[in-house]
Design a protein with these regions (language model features):
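Glycine-rich nucleotide-binding loop
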Residues: 117, 151-157
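Glycine-rich/acidic phosphate-handling loop/turn and adjacent ATP-lid/helix
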Residues: 96-132
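Short beta-to-alpha transition helix within the HATPase_c
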Residues: 3, 16-33, 88-94
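Short beta-strand/loop element within the Bergerat-fold HATPase_c
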Residues: 82-103
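Conserved short strand/loop->alpha-helix "switch" segment adjacent to the catalytic nucleotide/phosphoryl-transfer site
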Residues: 14-17, 36-69, 73-85, 126
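Glycine-rich ATP-binding loops of the HATPase_c
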Residues: 142-149
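C-terminal end segment of the histidine kinase catalytic
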Residues: 158-174
Length: 174
């Protein structure tokens, strides 16, 4: 939360956040916190530029990313000296929620790792872990969709839509 406030005050507008910049700082801070210097775990990010989100979107997404990256760093690479955590944020082409009069943009956030993966018998819809319950609740709060891909590690895919603000013509806040 402190990082969100810091990023807000750096920007020109105090009600929207450049989310890509925030994700970079958050992920780098998490990697430092878990001090992975003895392991060769890499962070790879592919982030949409000018993804300006209001606080109703930025705060839940920030908590989701924090939970997923922390989980990868704590659990994905036991006994392994190398690996990768990847974060991707992009606008979805032909999003299902686009309307002409109320411009809504669909986004995809994917957080993945190439670690040991998540057991097939773990159903995220009924998972008992507090982290998964929190992620599920926050995705629901965003009126989004959560998908788990178990190929080559774990990949959480979150699809969500945001209404664009009409008061900024060149870089609309979403």
């Amino acid at each position: 939360m402190a990082l969100i406030h810091e990023e807000l005050y750096k920007g020109e507008n105090t009600d929207t956040l450049n989310f890509s910049t925030y994700i970079k700082e958050l992920a780098e801070n998490l990697f430092q916190t878990y001090s992975l210097s003895s392991k060769n775990i890499h962070l790879n990010m592919d982030l949409e530029e000018n993804a300006l989100f209001n606080m109703d979107v930025a705060v839940p997404l920030g908590i989701i990313i924090n939970e997923l990256v922390s989980n990868s760093l704590k659990h994905a690479f036991p006994g392994r000296d190398s690996g990768e955590v990847r974060i991707e944020l992009r606008r979805e082409k032909n999003g299902k929620h686009k309307k002409e009069c109320n411009k809504v943009t669909s986004f995809i956030l994917a957080v993945s790792d190439n670690g040991i993966g998540i057991p097939e018998n773990l159903k995220i819809e009924v998972a008992g872990s507090l982290g998964i319950q929190l992620i599920t609740a926050l995705v629901h709060q965003l009126d989004g969709e959560l998908e788990l891909n178990r190929n080559n590690g774990a990949e959480f895919i979150i699809k969500f839509s945001v209404r664009e603000k009409s008061n900024q013509a060149s870089h609309p806040a979403v």
